[in-house]
C-alpha cells in the first residue's frame, strides 16, 4: 500500500451540518500492544468499528477492556514506546491516520477529531484561567489575537450553558463544580467544530442529575453540528437514550455489536447478558443484585479460546480452545438482523434460548 501524501488541506473541513455527512471513521483490525518488563500486554486485539456523521457509537466494557486505549490510538496520543500498533488501519474520511506524520496528525487532532476526557480537573491546567485555555484553541489553530480568542471563549461558555460566562471567563478550574468543569471540556472539544468527538467516560464522578444534564447537552450539540460521537463508558444506563449502536468490548476484543435498543432487548453474548442483569431495577426491590463472577483477565496472560470463558455460565470445551469470530446474528429462521454481531460459539442459545 502506498503512503498517503497528506497536505494541510487534504482532509475536507466541513463547517455546516449540510456538508458533514457520510462515513467519518473506520477502524479496521486494530491491534495495540504495550511492551513491559513482564511481557507484552495485548490491550487491543483486532477491533473493527465505524462511525457516520450524526451517529453515536457507544463502546462499552469493564476497566481493562481496551475501549480507552482504542480511543487514544485514534487520537494519536498513545505513549510509543511502550505502546505499539503492530497492525490495523484508522481511516478518517478514507485516509489512514496511522500513515500520517506527527505534523499531519496534529492538524487533524482538535480541528477534525476532538476528545473529552473523564477527569476534567486533571485535564485542565490549574494555573491558567478557563478562558485562556479555551482561547488557546483559536490562537493556535486559527491564528486569532488574544482579545478575539477571549470573546470566542465567552461565546463557547454561553453555548454549553455556564452561567455568567463573561464574569467567569477569568476563573480557574478549581473554582468550578465538577459538572461545570465537564461543560468546559465539552466547550473545548467543540471549539473548532470537529466532525467527530470521542467522549471517554464523560460523566464519571458526577451525580446522577448532573450526568443526565451533561449527556443531554452532548446529544443536543451533536444534533446541532451533525457530528459523529464515540461514547466510551462502562455504564449501560448512560447510553440507553443517547447511542444509536453499541460495541461491547472484553479483553481487547469486540464481543457484540447491535443497535442500542436491540441489545437491551435481546443480548447475543453472555458477557452482555451479565452486564444487563447487573443493572439495579426498581421493579426488583429486595432481590439480590446479580454480579458477573470472577475478574477481567490479566492481559499478559489472556485465557485460551474465548477470553470470557472462565467467567461464563455457558462455557463448554470449545470455548476454552477456539477463539470465536464476530459473526452476524440472525433470527431463528435465518433472517438478517442489521448491525448485529456476536463473538460467541453459543450466541443462538443466548439470544433465542
Task: Describe every region a protein language model picked out.
Residues 18-23, 163-167, 257-353:
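Short catalytic/signature loops enriched in Gly
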Residues 62, 198-202, 206-287:
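P-loop NTP-binding/switch modules centered on Walker-like glycine-rich loops
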Residues 81-86, 97-114, 132, 140, ...:
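ABC ATPase NBD coupling module
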Residues 89, 93-96, 148-167, 276:
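Conserved ABC ATPase "signature" region
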Residues 171-176, 180:
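Conserved ABC ATPase signature
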Residues 191-195:
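A short, proline-enriched helix->beta-strand linker immediately N-terminal to the Walker B motif
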Amino acid at each position: 500500500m502506498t503512503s498517503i501524501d497528506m497536505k494541510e488541506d487534504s482532509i475536507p473541513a466541513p463547517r455546516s451540518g449540510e456538508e458533514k455527512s457520510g462515513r467519518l471513521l473506520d477502524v479496521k483490525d486494530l491491534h495495540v500492544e504495550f511492551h513491559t518488563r513482564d511481557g507484552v500486554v495485548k490491550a487491543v486485539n483486532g477491533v473493527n468499528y465505524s462511525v457516520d456523521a450524526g451517529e453515536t457509537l457507544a463502546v462499552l466494557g469493564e476497566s481493562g477492556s481496551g475501549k480507552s486505549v482504542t480511543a487514544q490510538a485514534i487520537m494519536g496520543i498513545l505513549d510509543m514506546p511502550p505502546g505499539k500498533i503492530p497492525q490495523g488501519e484508522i481511516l478518517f474520511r478514507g485516509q489512514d491516520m496511522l500513515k500520517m506524520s506527527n505534523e499531519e496528525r496534529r492538524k487533524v487532532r482538535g480541528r477534525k477529531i476532538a476528545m473529552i476526557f473523564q477527569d476534567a480537573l486533571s485535564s485542565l491546567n490549574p494555573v491558567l484561567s478557563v478562558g485562556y485555555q479555551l482561547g488557546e484553541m483559536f490562537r493556535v489553530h486559527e491564528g486569532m489575537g488574544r482579545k478575539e480568542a477571549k470573546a470566542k471563549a465567552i461565546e463557547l461558555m454561553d453555548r454549553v450553558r455556564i452561567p455568567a460566562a463573561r464574569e467567569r471567563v477569568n476563573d480557574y478550574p478549581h473554582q468550578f463544580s465538577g459538572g461545570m468543569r465537564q461543560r468546559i471540556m465539552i466547550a473545548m472539544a467543540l471549539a473548532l467544530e470537529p466532525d467527530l468527538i470521542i467522549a471517554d467516560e464523560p460523566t464519571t464522578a458526577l451525580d446522577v442529575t448532573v450526568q443526565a444534564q451533561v449527556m443531554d447537552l452532548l446529544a443536543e450539540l451533536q444534533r446541532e453540528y451533525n457530528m459523529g460521537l464515540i461514547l466510551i463508558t462502562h455504564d449501560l444506563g448512560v447510553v440507553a437514550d443517547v447511542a444509536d449502536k453499541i460495541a461491547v468490548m472484553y479483553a481487547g476484543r469486540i464481543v457484540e455489536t447491535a443497535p442500542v435498543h436491540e441489545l437491551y432487548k435481546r443480548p447475543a453474548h453472555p458477557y452482555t447478558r451479565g452486564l444487563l442483569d447487573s443493572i439495579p431495577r426498581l421493579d426488583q426491590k429486595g432481590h439480590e443484585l446479580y454480579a458477573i463472577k470472577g475478574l477481567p483477565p490479566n492481559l499478559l496472560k489472556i485465557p485460551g479460546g474465548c477470553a470470557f470463558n472462565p467467567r461464563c455460565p455457558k462455557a463448554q470445551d470449545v470455548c476454552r480452545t477456539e477463539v470465536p469470530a464476530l459473526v452476524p446474528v440472525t433470527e431463528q429462521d435465518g433472517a438478517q438482523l442489521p448491525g448485529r454481531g456476536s463473538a460467541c460459539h453459543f450466541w443462538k442459545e443466548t439470544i433465542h434460548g
